[in-house]
Amino acid sequence: MSTEEKLNIFTQKLLEWNKIHNLTGSKSEEEVQENIEDALFALQFLPDTIQNALDIGTGAGFPGLVLAIAMPKTQWILTEPRQKRASFLHYMKSILNLSNVIVYKKRVEQIEAVPMDLITSRAVMKTKDLIDLSKKFITPSTTLLFYKGENLGDELKGMEHYSIFERGKRKYLLLKGDDVI
């Protein structure tokens, strides 16, 4: 199954589940597609050497599950403490045969510390709190990619080394481990 086919199945299943379980605010195929494009846009900023990745608060699959589909050679850990969303992620892992994905129905604080090449998160909490939660997974070469909104500037006070990329209202914050540990 191609990446495109997997993303199409993900879209349809998310819309089906969302009618019953209210997994995401995206209610139409267009809205889900926009969220997929939002997740995939960041691929151009990532190194191609990523072996493993952690997504904090995966929710209905953005960005972690979408990136795991697009990056099949990268081992992904998706953390989602809410039962209905974790169940959906397990279901998608199964029907899409995503052998590169591990889903934990836990908060990231409850996950065993393993050095990560990439840490992602979207709309979970403020940047400094995300960094603090991530510290046990960060090495000097870790890339941190946080999907943020328009008010990112307030969160960067006191930080010196970072890159910001924009797409519409989305701001992608890119940090290196050696700048935050």
Swiss-Prot record:
Its EC number is 2.1.1.170. It is found in: Cytoplasm. It is an enzyme of class 2 (transferase). It comes from the Bacteria. GO terms for molecular function: rRNA (guanine-N7-)-methyltransferase activity. Transmembrane segments: none annotated. Keywords: Cytoplasm, Methyltransferase, rRNA processing, S-adenosyl-L-methionine, Transferase. GO terms for cellular component: cytosol. It catalyses: guanosine(527) in 16S rRNA + S-adenosyl-L-methionine = N(7)-methylguanosine(527) in 16S rRNA + S-adenosyl-L-homocysteine. Its main location: cytoplasm. Pfam families: GidB. S-adenosyl-L-methionine binds at residues 57, 62, 108-109, 122. PANTHER family: S-ADENOSYL-L-METHIONINE-DEPENDENT METHYLTRANSFERASES SUPERFAMILY PROTEIN (PTHR31760:SF0). Belongs to the methyltransferase superfamily. RNA methyltransferase RsmG family. Specifically methylates the N7 position of guanine in position 527 of 16S rRNA. This is Ribosomal RNA small subunit methyltransferase G. It comes from Nitratiruptor sp. (strain SB155-2).
